[in-house]
Structure formats: C-alpha cells, structure tokens
Amino acid sequence: MTGVHIKDDSIDTTHGCILYIEGVTVSFDGFKALNDLNLYIDDGELRCIIGPNGAGKTTMMDVITGKTRPDKGAVFFGQNHDLTKMNEYEISHAGIGRKFQKPTVFQNHTVFENLELALHTRKDVWQTLTRSLTRVQIDTIEKDMETIGLKDQKNLRAGLLSHGQKQWLEIGMLLVQDPRLLLI
C-alpha cells in the first residue's frame, strides 16, 4: 500500500463506525499495556479517553496511527481499511490526524508558514520552489487561524508563541489537512 491516499468517499461507514478496535493486546517485555481492548467510535462522534499514567492511552493512539503494532486484535478505519497493515505515512494520508503531547511546530517559521507547510500539497523540490498558494488554500489557512485563535499572530515566528499557542498551532496544522478522524 505504499503511497496510498484514501479518498474520503472510500471510507465505508455504512454501519456508523469510523474507528473499530477489537481484541487489541499490546505487550512490552511481558507487561500488557493494552489487554483485549475494544473501542468503537461512530462517524462524527466526540470521544474522550481518560485514565491515569500507564493506563494505555498513548499506546492505544500509537496502535491507531501505526507507530506500535498490536500483538493481536483488529483495528479498522471505516469498515475496509485495516490499519494494522498500513504504515504511519499511509495512515496519516488516509485521513487520521494525531496531536502529540509536546507541540511539534517549525520554530523559525511564522504561524502562516507552519499552516502552509502542513497543507496536503506536492512537496517535491520543483513544486516547493515554483508554486504559489491558491485562493482556496489561503482561505483555508485564514479560516483555521481564526478557529485556533492565532489570526493576530499570523506573521509571528512560532518559536515566539507561548506553549499553549504552540499547542493550538499544531492543532491548526492538523485541521488544514482536513482529517476524517482527529486524535488529540
């Protein structure tokens, strides 16, 4: 499945589920970080996963995004995309976005440039040197800056933002990619 980009309409949610996790177990040196986890998230549903340190929240997100492979169990995006058979790149391009605990932004670039870099565009050398943003792309970035509350910081370098603003910028970097499933 290298180079896969799943079109939104190919994600089959006819039975409601956008994320299907069943019987997932993950062990690290004999310690079961996840033990027979079952989780079903419906399309459009907001779900909060809470628990103490070591409860398996990060491990679960690592399994969903392909960073960690389960010892057993099934993980599907929609009904027809087996995430256990996809790599991290394929999963992110399939429409799953993930926000990490520590913000990862380009410190020496402006807020606008960070959002521009996050857009789904061709990133080869020629395109990077010669392309300019379309009106739709600029509007998308400006709308997302408004959503994340950083419109007034548009031209400010990300390294000068507060920690909380960097968190919002990273969320904005996910939003401009228009993910079908967002893990925060």
Please provide the spans of the model-predicted regions.
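Catalytic Walker B motif of ABC-type/P-loop ATPase nucleotide-binding domains
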Residues: 182-184
